[in-house]
């Protein structure tokens, strides 16, 4: 059962009920709290575009608690974060793994955070192929291309050399929030919201 809390807000015109995500959106907060697929990406992209159109000068906060997911869906979110004018601040709550960690590192420089007990994990893309030898070869070339692209972008966002990223993403690489800060995925570990 998927229960989404409702918030009641008192206004001069009476009461208004919001689902919690709509209420947070009013404060320019977006929650990425699930695996990343096309539907989730479309929702995040829509929220980013809406907030950018509403006020292009005001920061947007993207809270991430995600095990990762689809590369193309994640890149749609990434490209939109870079495309819009407002800075997108990223905050890891819980876990940012795989594409979740990639998006965490893609936040505006100086505005990438994690809470103290968060865990961050980077690795190379996962994939599988079946079918004729030619189809397997095409799939293998594509995943190698995507791996190189993701490594280059992650190197740019962390300040690490591409060779270090290649080595460190060869297998699942789990980090504490402090280690992710040292690595350049985030800028600071937060213990309180007013430290942001």
Curated annotation (Swiss-Prot):
CDD domains: S14_ClpP_2 (cd07017). Keywords: Cytoplasm, Hydrolase, Protease, Serine protease. It catalyses: Hydrolysis of proteins to small peptides in the presence of ATP and magnesium. alpha-casein is the usual test substrate. In the absence of ATP, only oligopeptides shorter than five residues are hydrolyzed (such as succinyl-Leu-Tyr-|-NHMec, and Leu-Tyr-Leu-|-Tyr-Trp, in which cleavage of the -Tyr-|-Leu- and -Tyr-|-Trp bonds also occurs). It holds the Pfam family CLP_protease. SUPFAM superfamilies: ClpP/crotonase (SSF52096). GO terms for cellular component: cytoplasm; endopeptidase Clp complex. The active site is at 98 (nucleophile), 123. The keyword Cytoplasm applies. Transmembrane segments: none annotated. Its EC number is 3.4.21.92. Cleaves peptides in various proteins in a process that requires ATP hydrolysis. Has a chymotrypsin-like activity. Plays a major role in the degradation of misfolded proteins. Fourteen ClpP subunits assemble into 2 heptameric rings which stack back to back to give a disk-like structure with a central cavity, resembling the structure of eukaryotic proteasomes. PANTHER family: ATP-DEPENDENT CLP PROTEASE PROTEOLYTIC SUBUNIT (PTHR10381:SF70). This is ATP-dependent Clp protease proteolytic subunit. It comes from Geobacillus sp. (strain WCH70). The gene is clpP.
């Amino acid at each position: 059962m998927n229960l989404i809390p409702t918030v009641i807000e008192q206004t001069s015109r009476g009461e208004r009920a919001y689902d919690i995500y709509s209420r947070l959106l009013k404060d320019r907060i977006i929650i990425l709290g699930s695996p990343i697929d096309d539907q989730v990406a479309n929702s995040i992209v829509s929220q980013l575009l809406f907030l950018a159109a509403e006020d292009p000068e005001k920061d947007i906060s993207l809270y991430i608690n995600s095990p990762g997911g689809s590369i193309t869906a994640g890149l749609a979110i990434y490209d939109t974060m870079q495309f819009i004018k407002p800075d997108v601040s990223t905050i890891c709550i819980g876990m940012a793994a795989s594409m979740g960690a990639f998006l965490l590192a893609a936040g505006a420089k100086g505005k990438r955070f994690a809470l103290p007990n968060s865990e961050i994990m980077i690795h190379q893309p996962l994939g599988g192929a079946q079918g004729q030898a030619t189809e397997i070869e095409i799939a293998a070339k594509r995943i190698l291309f995507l791996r190189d692209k993701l490594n280059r972008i992650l190197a740019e966002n962390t300040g690490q050399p591409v060779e270090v990223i290649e080595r460190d993403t060869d297998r699942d690489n789990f980090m504490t929030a402090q280690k992710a800060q040292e690595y350049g995925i985030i800028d600071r570990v937060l213990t309180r919201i007013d430290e942001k």
